[in-house]
């Protein structure tokens, strides 16, 4: 029989759909397993094979766990709010809803062609009103808990995108989305109080089965520091508070530096310095935060004209303003200790400020005593504790813990996002919408461009913004900012537990059954974005008794990048692979220009993405799935090769021919059964360990041995087909029925391995002549003594030729020695 994946794969995909083969059942008395992908943003580019690595891995696990008797929840949905659809709408006038739906249909078609075993009945998009009704409701819950608030703050503003960006959405002064310049501006924003959960978010990491590098990234982002809050008196009327992790260096303070955005700045400026300071602040506001704190940046600053009093010596300390100090961390004021801090030293040297050595080479305090302040000779924690106690006694300081983590800037000046369900009144009060007013839908508009600085496109729709509030009988204005793309992905994993609930975002019963997510797979780029935000929301829900687990994702795996060859004309851009040709070892473009050839992350922008449908049409989805795993360890970067897919197709051809040959018979062959049992055992172990890249090799080794049999035992082949089903499900379903079993291989379960077949039945005999090693022979333990001796004679025949063997020494399973 001929293997034709185009017919087989379509046939079984229709069978699965018709029989709802992958529908999850929370009413089951089975143990549960929840396996989830980080759901994709449905872009216009569609999926390339790099996206399929993680999806294939989760599908293998889902199919395996079903076969092992678990109730499996394996859903897929769409993170469908986002900036690209809105930018496309600005260029073309096409409503983001239309392009998003078109893209979703394309993604759905691509995923379906791969044979992924999703519970399609639970699919949703974050831009569905039935979904974001609950996103809005959950935002209002945060608001009622005091965790959502409005404040004027310095923000990252991108003029090109026309919106504010969070710190996590800016990299090297450019927007992550599009790479456009970002400026700092003051703007009234909605903010989520994630800092209230700093300690819980840190502590929760300890028990998670996550990659250590991801946990460390989150620890660093939260940035817990223990130190002291020190008060410096200014003009005998107010204090500047400084957080420092090194209070033991207080004797070396020679200046203070204040962030340009600090609320006290205006009061600190002397009149003769006002013009210079205000000019400096304007310049600082145009810079991104990352530019300001760059270690390579030359330190700049301006003197305020004002002095603070040193809390120990009473000396006058000049107060400067510099953009290397950021308001959000600590107190927004730095005490300059240039002898023992590199940034402070650079600043002091730039402005000829004094430098006082107060620590020796052993970090022991020196030159710090003053009156009853006796710090010299102390070191480390003892010195820090002494300073804190001294300052506390004088009401000039105390111990304090600070965090780098800042509250989450939540609002965006966009159209294609969840409207924030708040009405503002003229007296400065506001009202959250009630349940019967949700979902709050955005108006239909024609112009998707932002309405000037700080105003999103919604601000232009006056009939939607300016309303008579029937609940209060007052005139009001709707909030015109929208939520960020992260809002919908903060809780989508919970909605999958109860996707059709019209009364609540999820039911307690379903949540208790399915949560937490047992296996979560996605890209490492989400380490301090989605993963931190969703942990924050989940922790709030947990403390409110809305969910049963403190953490949402039990085990996390970050799939590695998929690399492919890219071709680039230096200074101009990338060209398609089909437009590149090699000429005497030099790659040239179709226009005759020399190309730079690299192995880079597969992406649309680099023109090196591979459309999976092309490979499916040529080799079949099962071959593509198999190579997606064979290409390398799941969590490592890997170089893509279409030839590798071809190799997996050849293996499947061979396997199909073997399983459908006349040699398949109902016989009991111990060797064939041993090969099958060992393979099933090895594949099961590899899936449990997520060593998925070794599985294809195991099948290839199996077939090389199995074809040596004269007769292929049907029961052994059936076991192997069951083991192949998670990796190559279409061909496995087909061969399962060819072997005489009822359709629906998942329902047949995972084959039971008999331990007796796992024993090593082969043994290596050492063959000696007069005690000297002459050969080694591998053979089955069950081989008779007579056969072993016969084979041994053949192996060393040249050493025995023409000589008399006086004695044959035989040690079972170990040695044969011919004594001449």
Swiss-Prot record:
For this protein, what is the EC number? Answer: 6.1.1.4
- Write down the chemical reaction(s) this protein catalyses: tRNA(Leu) + L-leucine + ATP = L-leucyl-tRNA(Leu) + AMP + diphosphate
Biological processes per GO annotation: leucyl-tRNA aminoacylation
- Annotated residues that bind ATP are located at 604
Q: Name one Pfam family in it.
A: tRNA-synt_1
Is Calcium found in the keyword set?
A: no
Instruction: Indicate the family of this protein.
Output: Belongs to the class-I aminoacyl-tRNA synthetase family.
Q: Which UniProt keywords apply?
A: Aminoacyl-tRNA synthetase, ATP-binding, Cytoplasm, Ligase, Nucleotide-binding, Protein biosynthesis
Top-level EC class, please? ligase
UniProt main location, coarse = cytoplasm
The organism encoding this protein is Chlamydia caviae (strain ATCC VR-813 / DSM 19441 / 03DC25 / GPIC) (Chlamydophila caviae)
Q: Show where the record puts the motif 'HIGH' region.
A: 40-51
Specify the protein name: Leucine--tRNA ligase
InterPro entries in the record: aa-tRNA-synth_I_CS (IPR001412), aa-tRNA-synth_Ia (IPR002300), Leu-tRNA-ligase (IPR002302), Leu_tRNA-synth_edit (IPR025709), M/V/L/I-tRNA-synth_anticd-bd (IPR013155), Methionyl/Leucyl_tRNA_Synth (IPR015413), Rossmann-like_a/b/a_fold (IPR014729), tRNAsynth_Ia_anticodon-bd (IPR009080)
Localization (cell): Cytoplasm
Q: Name one GO cellular component term.
A: cytosol
Which GO terms label this protein's molecular function in UniProt? aminoacyl-tRNA deacylase activity; ATP binding; leucine-tRNA ligase activity
Residues forming the motif 'KMSKS' region are 601-605
């Amino acid at each position: 029989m001929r293997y034709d994946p185009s017919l087989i794969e379509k046939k079984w995909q229709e069978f699965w759909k018709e029989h709802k083969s992958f529908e999850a059942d929370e009413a089951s008395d089975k143990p549960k397993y929840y396996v989830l992908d980080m759901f994709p943003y449905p872009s216009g580019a569609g999926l390339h094979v790099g996206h399929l690595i993680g999806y294939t891995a989760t599908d293998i696990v889902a199919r395996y766990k079903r076969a092992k008797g678990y109730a499996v929840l394996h859903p897929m949905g769409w993170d469908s709010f986002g900036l690209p659809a809105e930018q496309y709408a600005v260029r073309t006038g096409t409503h983001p809803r239309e392009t998003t739906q078109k893209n979703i249909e394309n993604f759905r078609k691509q995923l379906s062609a791969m044979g992924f075993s999703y519970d399609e009945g639970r699919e949703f998009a974050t831009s569905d009103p039935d979904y974001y009704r609950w996103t809005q409701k959950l935002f209002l819950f945060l608001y009622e808990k005091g965790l959502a608030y409005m404040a004027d703050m310095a923000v990252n503003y991108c003029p090109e995108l026309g919106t504010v960006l969070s710190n996590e959405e800016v990299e090297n002064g450019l927007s992550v989305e599009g790479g456009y310049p970002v400026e700092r501006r003051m703007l009234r924003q909605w903010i989520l109080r994630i800092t209230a959960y700093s300690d819980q978010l840190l502590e929760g990491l300890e028990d998670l089965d996550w990659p250590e590098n991801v946990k460390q990234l989150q620890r660093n982002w939260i940035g817990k520091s223990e130190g002291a809050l020190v008060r410096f008196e200014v003009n005998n009327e107010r204090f500047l508070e400084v957080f420092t992790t090194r209070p033991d260096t207080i004797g070396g303070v020679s200046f203070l530096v204040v962030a340009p955005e600090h609320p006290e700045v205006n009061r600190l400026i002397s009149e003769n310095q006002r013009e210079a300071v205000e000019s400096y602040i304007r310049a600082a506001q145009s810079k991104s935060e990352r530019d300001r704190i760059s270690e390579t940046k030359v330190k700049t600053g301006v003197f305020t004209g004002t002095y603070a009093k040193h809390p120990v010596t009473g000396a006058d300390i000049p107060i400067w303003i510099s953009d290397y100090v950021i308001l959000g961390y600590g107190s927004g004021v730095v005490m300059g200790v240039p002898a023992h801090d590199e940034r402070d030293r650079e600043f002091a040297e730039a402005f000829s400020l004094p430098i006082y050595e107060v620590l020796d080479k052993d970090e022991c305090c020196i030159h710090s005593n003053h009156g009853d302040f006796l710090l010299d000779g102390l070191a480390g924690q003892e010195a820090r504790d002494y300073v804190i106690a001294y300052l506390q006694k004088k009401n000039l300081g105390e111990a304090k813990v600070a965090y780098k983590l800042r509250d989450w800037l939540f609002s965006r000046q966009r159209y294609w996002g969840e409207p924030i369900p708040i009405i503002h009144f003229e007296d400065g009060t506001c009202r959250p919408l009630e349940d019967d007013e949700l979902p709050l839908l955005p108006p239909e508009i024609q112009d998707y461009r932002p309405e000037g600085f700080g105003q999103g496109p919604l601000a232009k729709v006056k009939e939607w913004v300016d309303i008579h509030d029937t609940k209060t009988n007052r005139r009001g204005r709707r909030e015109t900012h929208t939520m960020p793309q992260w809002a919908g992905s903060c809780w989508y994993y919970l909605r999958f537990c109860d996707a059709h609930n019209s009364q609540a975002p999820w039911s307690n019963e379903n949540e208790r059954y399915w949560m937490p997510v047992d296996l979560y797979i996605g890209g490492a780029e989400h380490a301090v974005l989605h993963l931190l935000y969703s942990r924050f929301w989940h922790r709030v829900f947990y403390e409110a008794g809305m969910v049963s687990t403190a953490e949402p994702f039990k085990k996390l795996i970050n799939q590695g990048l998929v690399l492919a060859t890219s071709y680039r004309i230096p200074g101009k851009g990338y060209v398609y692979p089909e437009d590149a040709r090699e000429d005497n070892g030099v790659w040239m473009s179709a226009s005759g220009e020399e190309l730079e050839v690299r192995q880079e992350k597969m992406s649309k922008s680099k023109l090196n993405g591979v459309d999976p449908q092309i490979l499916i049409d040529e080799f079949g989805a099962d071959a593509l799935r198999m190579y997606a795993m064979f290409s390398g360890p799941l969590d490592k970067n890997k170089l893509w090769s279409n030839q590798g897919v071809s190799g997996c197709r050849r293996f499947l051809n061979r396997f199909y021919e073997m399983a459908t040959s006349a040699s398949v018979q109902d016989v009991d062959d111990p060797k064939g059964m041993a090969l099958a049992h060992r393979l099933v055992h090895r594949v099961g172990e590899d899936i449990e360990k997520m060593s998925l890249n070794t599985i294809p090799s195991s099948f290839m080794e199996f077939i090389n041995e199995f074809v040596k049999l004269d007769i292929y035992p049907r029961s052994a082949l059936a076991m192997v087909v069951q083991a192949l089903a998670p990796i190559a499900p279409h061909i496995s379903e087909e061969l399962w029925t060819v072997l005489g079993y009822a359709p629906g291989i998942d329902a047949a379960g995972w084959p039971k391995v008999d331990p007796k077949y796992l024993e090593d039945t082969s043994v290596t005999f050492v063959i000696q002549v007069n005690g000297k090693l002459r050969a080694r022979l591998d053979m089955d333990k069950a081989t008779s003594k007579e056969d072993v001796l016969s084979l041994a004679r053949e192996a060393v025949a040249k050493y025995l030729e023409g000589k008399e063997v006086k004695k044959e020494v035989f040690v079972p399973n170990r040695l044969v020695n011919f004594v001449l």
